[in-house]
């Protein structure tokens, strides 16, 4: 007969949040840890395109590394193009940190983080509802019509 387990594990402190831009969806899994940030299994500074690297770093630069030092964030991103994916990732990271602080730290620091992010750029927390409009007949695009000739 097996001996009963003496050491009981406490539940893992984690939150799962998503960020969206156009058709790109990024899911961030945030748990207590040592400040590791990974996107699709790769470190944040290896995400392409290099031009948009600072867009990804914005939440970290705004809040400081000490806010991220106690958490590990894993992000998986699918769909959309390069730019949309970068915007979805930064939104997912920001929302994950706020959700973690609200659930496991305290409300005051969560509000402080949220105020800093919203003051800088609202799209860090709020999804952009704009979508591509479908093409209609009678023209080359959604709104443009073919040129009309009277002679």
From Swiss-Prot:
A Pfam family that the UniProt record links to this protein: Ribosomal_S9
Superkingdom per UniProt: Eukaryota
UniProt GO BP: maturation of SSU-rRNA from tricistronic rRNA transcript (SSU-rRNA, 5.8S rRNA, LSU-rRNA); translation
UniProt GO molecular function: RNA binding; structural constituent of ribosome
SUPFAM superfamilies linked to this entry: Ribosomal protein S5 domain 2-like
GO cellular component, one term: cytosolic small ribosomal subunit
Keyword Ribosomal protein applies: yes
InterPro entries: Ribosomal_Su5_D2-typ_SF, Ribosomal_uS9, Ribosomal_uS9_CS, Ribsml_uS5_D2-typ_fold_subgr
Similarity comment: family membership: Belongs to the universal ribosomal protein uS9 family.
Name of protein: Small ribosomal subunit protein uS9
